[in-house]
Structures are given as C-alpha cells and as structure tokens.
Amino acid sequence: MKNIMKLFLYAALPLALIALGSCSYPKNITFKADSQTGALSGLYLTSDTSMNWILRTDGTQYEWVDSRYRWGLGHLRINGTEYSWNIPTKKHDTSHHMTVKYQTGDIEINVARKWNRDGNLVESYEFVNTGEKDADLQDIAINTPFNDNYPDARTCYEARCNAHIWAGGNEAYVYCTRMSGAPGGLGLIMEEGAIKGYEVRERPQKNGSSNFRGVFQLNPQDKTLKPGECYTIQWLLLSADNWDEFQAKAIDNGLIIASADRYVVEAGEKINVSFKSNCPSLKGKLLLNGKEVAEVSGDNITYTTTINEPGEKIFTLAYGNGKQTSVECLAVSNFDSLVNHRCQFIAGHQQFIKPGDPRSGAFIVYDKRYRIPLHQRRKWQQTL
C-alpha cells in the first residue's frame, strides 16, 4: 500500500509543478504589444476592454502620431549626444510577463512587464552602462501617450480620458479619468526611481492645437552611471473607480500623496501642506524653497505656515536615502490687484477697436514676446 501511495505521489508531483508554473493572477490591466518594437499599442482595463487608454501610434488616429511614440519607447542624451530606443535586440514574452532589450549607444535598456498578486501591471525600465567610461544620462523621456484628445463629443464621452500628471519626484503618479465622468480610471504610481517632469510632443497649431493635448512623455531624473552600473525606473499600473479610491490604492501600495489645502494664496494667508502614507515610521525633513523648516514624522505629516511674501513656494519632503517629493504653491500680493491688473492689460492690449471692421470690440490674441497682437505679427512676418 505504501509503495502504491509513493507511486501516486511521484506521478502527481510533475502535474503539481506544471500547475504551479502555469498559475496566473487575475489581471486588472491588459495590453497589446507591437511585435516589431516590443512597445505597447494598447492598454485596457479588464473590466472594460472597449476603451484604449493610449493613442494609436500607427498614424490612423492622428497622422503625425506614428510608431516613434509607442508606449515604452523614448529618447535620452548620453554625454550630450541624443539617442533613442525603438528597435529591440532581444524580446521574450509569455502569458505572464514580457521582457524587451534595447541598445542605444553604450546604454542597454531592459524593459520588463509583469502582473503582481493583485493583478496590477508592473513595468520597469533598467538603464545599464555597457561602455568603458562614465555615462551621463540627461533628458530621459519615456513615451506614455495617454489618450487625452478631443475629436468629437461622442468619442470623447465613450473613449477618451483626462490625464492628470503629478511629477512629484520619487512619489510621482498619473491618474487618468474618463471624460464622461463614469467610474473606472487608469492609475500609474512610482515604485522605484523618480519622475522630475513631463513633456508634451506634437502639439503645434497645425496638429489640432487645443483639440489635441499631445503625446506625453515622462521624464525620469538625470543620472550618471559608471561602467556596469544600472539605473531603474519602475511603476505600477492599476485601475480605480475615482480619485478617492486611486489615492487609497496608491497609499496602500507605498506611495506618499503630497497635497495642499490651497495652491494659490494671498501674501499674509496661511497654507497647509500634507504628506500621507502607509508608513507610521516615516521620518524626514521639510524644506521650504530649499531651506529646512521642520523635522517631521508619521504616516500623516502636516505643516502649516503663513506666507508673507509673494512668489513660488516649494514644500519638499526629504526622507529615506536621498528620496524626496514636493508640493508647489504660489503666493500673490493681492487677488483684487492681480485681477485689476489683468483686466487693464486685456482692455489695453487685447481688445480690437476699429469702427466699421466686423472684428471691432472682439478680444484677440496678444503676443507678449513681440508686444503686438498676433494678427499684426503675422502681417509683419510676411513682409520680411
């Protein structure tokens, strides 16, 4: 009997290992990848696959948005010379994960995509210096072409989003809401590395101007790599029904949410900033425009101060091993005087007055660089 049981166990073991190897977590986010570039051409919520949250990059949605702008491709400067990555040297994908390798100059870029236990998509970009000298990486830009544009009312209502980007350093995030206001949005939160800003490409007037918000690219912090050294940017893509749920999920996944009760105040008024996390043991220093103002700790850090002088006010939480995130606010001398000054400028520079002209009384665009109305600047340029 014991021998029979052993035989049964030995026979069952390979089947169990196969089952473990093939098991997969539920997927809240799914994607389509381009077979040639390894970049993403589609990004979807599993709960509603009818909406693609990123631009079609084959020229069919906008003729100027082509394969250069596919999700996950990008460009950077290496020791002052600009490079881009778009053709993989190696690619491997299964139903559980995907890896793509690129080489540009002396920098190897390894892109990995996989699902975590919660069914959220983890995406990482590893930059490796394969050269024999230090590599100064600057102006890094990773394509994240969120589908934020305005073709027509029905399309906007059913299949477009508003992308809200918080370039908050190590605690950066993006939350895309449906233009219809319906529940269900796409979130992106940083897990490793930092995002210092973002770019918007392909948005000149001839490309739709205000109806096309452009192609978004996230900008990681600059980095100098010694030979063999690597630098990783990693973020998590998840779904959330609304802003409250997104922030709750972001905090639960380790993000620090920075905010202020007001982002524009008059000089002499108080402002409250907060940094919420799921880490009660968090300790750090709070800086105001680079100057330390307080030592802080806890999972709900708050700071209140009176702003006495107008200008930009940057509240920075510095913590951990060189990590930081910031809240930027603006103080003005007086709202009434600001509005009055603006109204005087509009009346004096932007109202077209010419009796008999059908445009008389209309408000026009004023070019502050040349200090003349836009239509006059165009006439002047045509005479050059």
For each predicted feature, which ranges?
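Catalytic cores of secreted or luminal carbohydrate-active enzymes
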Residues: 215-254
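Beta-strand-rich N-terminal accessory domains
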Residues: 23-124, 128-195, 203-206, 215, ...
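Solvent-exposed, conformationally flexible loop/turn segments
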Residues: 227-228, 265-270, 298
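Extracellular ectodomain segments of secreted/surface proteins
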Residues: 241-280
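Bacterial N-terminal signal peptides
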Residues: 10-19
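Extended acidic/polar, glycine-enriched regions
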Residues: 279-339
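Beta-strand-rich interaction surfaces with strong enrichment in secreted/lumenal proteins
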Residues: 111-114, 220-224, 293-294, 303-305
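An acidic-aromatic substrate-binding cleft motif
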Residues: 256, 260-272, 324-384
